[in-house]
C-alpha cells in the first residue's frame, strides 16, 4: 500500500491565489465541452470526496469534504464520459492526495488497483 508522502504545509500559501476572470471563463468553457462533446473510448476513473462543505462558518468537516466542487455533480457527470466509468469516493478533501494519510493510502491503493485492471 502507498500512503504518499508527508505533506509540507509550510510550502502552501496561507491565502489563495487571485482568480482572474479569464481563468474562470476557461474553466466554464471546459465544463461545457466536457458536458456536451466528450465521448471517450477508454475506461475512466473518477475519484471524488464523499461530501461537500460550502458553509461560510469554519468546521472540521472541511478536512473530510470537498470545499471547492460538488462531488455528487462530478460523479454524475463522470458517468457520461465513457461506457466504462469507475466512481471511487473517499472521505477526503478537494485534492484527495492532500487528505490525511489513511485517505491518501486508500486513494493510491484504488488508483493503482484500477490501473492494474484497466491499463495494459
What are these model-predicted stretches?
Residues 76, 80-120:
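Catalytic active-site module of serine/aspartate enzymes centered on a nucleophile-bearing elbow/loop
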Residues 55-85:
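Active-site-adjacent alpha-helix of alpha/beta-hydrolase-fold enzymes
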Amino acid at each position: 500500500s502507498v500512503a504518499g508522502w508527508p505533506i509540507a504545509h509550510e510550502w502552501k500559501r496561507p491565502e489563495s491565489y487571485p482568480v482572474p476572470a479569464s481563468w474562470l471563463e476557461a474553466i466554464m468553457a471546459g465544463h461545457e465541452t466536457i458536458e456536451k462533446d466528450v465521448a471517450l473510448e477508454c475506461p475512466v476513473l473518477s475519484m471524488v470526496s464523499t461530501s461537500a462543505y460550502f458553509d461560510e462558518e469554519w468546521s472540521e468537516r472541511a478536512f473530510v469534504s470537498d470545499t471547492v466542487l460538488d462531488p455528487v455533480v462530478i460523479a454524475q457527470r463522470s458517468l457520461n464520459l465513457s461506457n466504462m466509468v469507475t466512481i471511487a469516493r473517499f472521505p477526503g478533501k478537494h485534492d484527495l492526495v492532500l487528505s490525511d494519510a489513511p485517505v491518501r493510502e486508500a486513494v493510491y491503493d484504488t488508483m493503482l488497483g484500477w490501473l492494474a485492471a484497466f491499463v495494459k
